[in-house]
Amino acid sequence: MKLGKVELCHFLQLIALFLCFSGMSQAELPRSRSKPYFQSGRSRTKRSWVWNQFFVLEEYMGSDPLYVGKLHSDVDKGDGSIKYILSGEGASSIFIIDENTGDIHATKRLDREEQAYYTLRAQALDRLTNKPVEPESEFVIKIQDINDNEPKFLDGPYTAGVPEMSPVGTSVVQVTATDADDPTYGNSARVVYSILQGQPYFSVEPKTGVIKTALPNMDREAKDQYLLVIQAKDMVGQNGGLSGTTSVTVTLTDVNDNPPRFPRRSYQYNVPESLPVASVVARIKAADADIGVNAEMEYKIVDGDGLGIFKISADKDTQEGIITIQKELDFEAKTSYTLRIEAANRDADPRFLSLGPFSDTTTVKIIVEDVDEPPVFSSPLYPMEVSEATQVGHIIGTVAAHDPDSSNSPVRYSIDRNTDLERYFNIDANSGVITTAKSLDRETNAVHNITVLAMESQNPSQVGRGYVAITILDINDNAPEFAMDYETTVCENAQPGQVIQKISAVDKDEPSNGHQFYFSLTTDMTNNHNFSLKDNKDNTASILTRRNGFRRQEQSVYYLPIFIVDSGSPSLSSTNTLTIRVCDCDADGIAQTCNAEAYVLPAGLSTGALIAILACVLTLLVLILLIVTMRRRKKEPLIFDEERDIRENIVRYDDEGGGEEDTEAFDMAALRNLNAIRDSKTRRDVTPEIQFLSRPTFKNIPDNVIFREFIWERLKEADVDPGAPPYDSLQTYAFEGNGSVAESLSSLDSISSNSDQNYDYLSDWGPRFKRLAEMYGNGQESLYS
């Protein structure tokens, strides 16, 4: 705990000592009677012992132990036969007792804020027997408070807000300080508040700590934040009291007390007449000293000749007024516009209307600049009609365009061929007259939508576009025909007058009054005895049987020509043939079998199925023939077949581990071939002139001579060979010797050459060389057998 001033502490200590000594009078000591005490079966007279009511001053800093009080028993005659002991809270550690006199002292500095009192127990013992002479009694040592704690603001520093323009006495915030001293003892914990910084704008209530405004109409736009320092002092603010301070930041919140104002009374902007609709012309902004919702604006055009041409709206983020175009501008029609624009706060505060008006106006002049515009057509769409029977070169209609600029340049016309790929139409470049360029067919394309281009003669880059919709009028140029391919059947047991088919017709033409078709049989079929036709007068006709009993064996198919006439002018007609098949039907008249050949084919297979089966058989035969041919080719001998190679065999293994074994054997006798040593190596960069040379037989020579000569010859070849590897590279050489009777296989001539060498001895080498003997011996004819 913090201590007060040194002088105050010394003064309080003297007072406490005076109180303690004055309380030691025996007449003032309270008595405590103990219960009767019995020992050895004999009653003992009841004794009593007394002690002070103890108080200890906190924060004692003296060098000697602080005297607390004195314990005394009635049985104590002062002869030293009684000793006193102390137990309980702080006994021996904080409080000690003189066992002879009963004086209690405090050995440590005490702090009431840590512990306000201590509960202890006193005991008087006979010094000789060490037995109690009085019952144990409990007492309390209370710590007396001193003003050693200053007030503290536990929630500081504070921040608060108050609306600007608030009246005097408006509550801002309440601050609270706490004092750890004893509130029930003196004025150590009684706090009062005062303001050290922030006057004359704010004040604080001394007892409650409520901060209030002290000046009226504080303006946020002038100063929006204040820093206050508040003091809390104990001892009711008297001299010698302890104090603590905290800071309070007060922010003035905004109210709508400032009207909007345009920084300029007039504005002027230039825009080209080609500016598209909805484009931004300009942005203007009225200034408002307020912030947030109090600065939100609404703009509107209140007057001027641009009403309906322009509009203005507010940008919610920037609070600017955005002027945009509503209709196209035309320099030739009007060169300038004047707008009267008003800006007003969206939400006005009724308390401050006297500071208004909360709106302002300005003038905006918009100058329209002339630009070179493309030609303009007199109509956005030209509908035209033409008959499909119209001849080439017929005039369909005319389009017209003009230059809207003051120069009024001549206009030339053309057709955008991307909209007329077939080039059905032409247009006169000067007059805009559209004519047909090809014969038209409504059934192919009933409507042609083409784009006409109009460009200035003096500036071809200025192009206007007009749209023409040409509708092709229909003429009766298509004959009627069956509406579908009919599959008509008649049962063998059909009765006369039975309807076997109902037919209808279609026509690609589209007459204005709709189609009307007339059906009849052709002249040569009018008197046939099998079928008749009935026109139903509703663009349909019915086919009926004339006799009963049809037999597939006699005739399985009937062809009935039908004559159809339309109602066009002139009318067109066509003859369509209806195919009627005779079928075997069940009791319900449902056809079961309609083909006479079904009685002939045993398995009921159609012609298509037979063709498919035949194709499969042929495919199998071709595959079998191909396999046989490939096998026969594989039996032909190959000169370089691995089984017929008489070189030394190379045995390869794929085993891993155990070191490396070189199994590629070679015949050392081959090194004895002197010819291999003496012959120069074939140059890689020179084309050989002779493809084959027979090798003569050489006699045997010593091995050391063979190796020396072989290495010497190969060294000279490597020195003069332009294609040889680098100098420090590894050279590998091998040649065939004369140890074999047949010499090297490389000396064998091709079977196609005219060699007369005799290889009959190959037959004596055994079964492994049988094939080689057949190839080069007398039996080589078998190679081609």
Swiss-Prot record:
Glycosylated residues in this chain: N449, N530
GO biological process: homophilic cell adhesion via plasma membrane adhesion molecules
Principal subcellular localisation of the protein: membrane
UniProt cross-references to Gene3D superfamilies, sorted A to Z: Cadherins (2.60.40.60), TCF3-CBD (Catenin binding domain) (4.10.900.10)
Cell compartment(s), UniProt: Cell membrane
Record membrane topology: Single-pass type I membrane protein
Maturation propeptide residues: 28-47
Assigned keywords, A-Z: Calcium, Cell adhesion, Cell membrane, Cleavage on pair of basic residues, Glycoprotein, Membrane, Metal-binding, Repeat, Signal, Transmembrane, Transmembrane helix
Single annotated GO MF: calcium ion binding
This protein's GO CC annotations: plasma membrane
Residue spans, topological domain Cytoplasmic: 629-785
InterPro entries referenced in this protein's UniProt entry, alphabetically: Cadherin, Cadherin-like_dom, Cadherin-like_sf, Cadherin_CS, Cadherin_Y-type_LIR, Catenin-bd_sf
Occurrences of domain Cadherin (ranges): 49-153, 154-262, 263-377, 378-482, 482-599
Transmembrane regions: 608-628
Side Extracellular, residues: 28-607
Domain of life from the UniProt record: Eukaryota
Signal sequence, start to end: 1-27
Domain notes: Three calcium ions are usually bound at the interface of each cadherin domain and rigidify the connections, imparting a strong curvature to the full-length ectodomain.
Task performed by this protein: Cadherins are calcium-dependent cell adhesion proteins. They preferentially interact with themselves in a homophilic manner in connecting cells; cadherins may thus contribute to the sorting of heterogeneous cell types.
Protein name: Cadherin-7
Organism: Mus musculus (Mouse)
